[in-house]
Amino acid sequence: KKLIDFIKRKKDLIFYLILAFIIFIGTYIRTLNISKLKDITTGTWTLGPDLDPFLFLRWAEYIVKNGSLMAHDAMRNVPLGFDTAGEMKLLSYMIAWFHNILSTLSLSDSVTYSAILFPVAMFAFTALAFFLFAKKVFYKENKLIRNSIALIATLLFVLVPSLLPRTIAGIPEKESVAFFFMFMAFYFFLEAFTSEKFKFSLIYGVLAGIMTGLMALVWGGMIFVFFTISSAVLISFILEKIKV
């Protein structure tokens, strides 16, 4: 009886503990391959079998060493080189910032190792963002139903096989960061859409715009945000859910 009373009083705490466990399971699965990412010939770390991450790593190493990215990359599109202003550079900067944090805490001795851990760390934040988004979708339900649905959805999200290759350790791809910004954009949009006070709608709308802009600095797939939000607003207008 005491246990039941405790659970009733601490329902929110129980939900967040379950969420933490779900995220832990997801991150654990995504770090099982780390021991395989060490080059047995040199004893140094290397990224997984993907092409783009090596470019992002090289740029991140340059940023860590020099403070900012070069304007012209002579190693890309040889012999003409490549104007880095034409590429989405935020990912490499985020890897560099992540390395600076880990190295300060003595948790990483190389940019490569930090890049290996980076997609897993971003996945944890993405899972949290997805939980908030899923919970907000069912904002009209009571708290128990909202949290339960969001937890089940998050569990399926962290275990879905198609997401694993883009969020696993050693593959610092654009999607590992972009998904976080995407779900936060959706979450803030729903907050703005459902808020009863104009000032809060404005604040959340601005935050949704910022998240969308940050996603655009990482991944061209930000167009999904435009399509999703515009379609949702159009359908709501047709169903007379929006007062004009």
Segments from the language model and where they lie:
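Membrane-embedded helix bundles of polyisoprenyl
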Residues: 24-27, 118-196, 200-241
